[in-house]
Regions:
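Aromatic- and charge-enriched surface segment that lines or borders ligand/interaction sites
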Residues: 1-11, 38, 48, 162-166
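Extracytoplasmic
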Residues: 22-26, 32-36, 111-113, 124, ...
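Ligand-site clamp/hinge motif
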Residues: 132-168
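Solvent-exposed, polar/charged alpha-helical surfaces in well-ordered, non-transmembrane soluble domains
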Residues: 3-4, 101, 114, 127, ...
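Surface-exposed binding/hinge segments that line
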Residues: 17-96
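Bilobed "Venus flytrap"/periplasmic-binding protein-like clamshell domains
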Residues: 107-138, 158-162
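A mature extracytoplasmic/lumenal domain signature
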Residues: 33-35, 41-45, 131-133, 157, ...
């Protein structure tokens, strides 16, 4: 994410997220292992950890194995151009950003680390989420979270909610 997305001027025209800077300076970034990275600032960054834990968290990772098919540095140009045309995007960067939106749940093929995975198209009036079998948290008894296997959100006009509730 850091090298291929956050610091790519085509994908992030204003650069990395503001919360990654301390007094205007970006951190040093190191890959420690296949599973670990390190961000190191010259001075403390009091905003970084709260940003990771916020309701709309700072996503400092991406599923490279999936996203590389939409990135000009990794995908074959002919394949990438076909995808750009098929999805009616103006260029590869617009396609990459469309397929990479972790906040909208509009790409049901995007691998996520969240507790549930959206399995319905966002254009529908029902959003269906299934438990992510790869979610990384467990409870104190060792059972994988979340407990709920599936939930469905019905999207309706606020004038219809009373009627829908009344009819079950």
């Amino acid at each position: 994410w850091w090298e291929d997305v956050a610091n790519n001027p085509k994908l992030s025209p204003v650069g990395p997220p503001k919360v990654m800077k301390v007094e205007g300076k970006l951190p040093q970034f190191k890959i420690l292992s296949n599973l670990s990275v390190q961000y190191e600032w010259e001075k403390p960054n009091p905003d970084f950890l709260p940003a990771l834990a916020s309701a709309s968290p700072l996503y400092i990772y991406r599923p490279a194995h999936y996203m590389r098919q939409f990135h000009k540095d990794f995908a074959a140009n002919s394949k990438l151009q076909k995808l750009v045309t098929a999805t009616k995007q103006r260029n590869w960067a617009a396609l990459h950003n469309k397929m990479d939106n972790l906040y909208r749940n509009d790409n049901i093929d995007l691998p996520v680390l969240q507790p549930w995975v959206c399995v319905s198209k966002s254009s529908s009036n029902r959003l269906r989420f299934k438990r992510n079998a790869f979610f990384h948290r467990i409870d104190p008894q060792g059972q994988q979270l979340p407990y709920v296997d599936e939930f469905i959100f019905g999207i309706a006009n606020n004038k219809l909610i009373s009627a829908k509730t009344g009819t079950g």
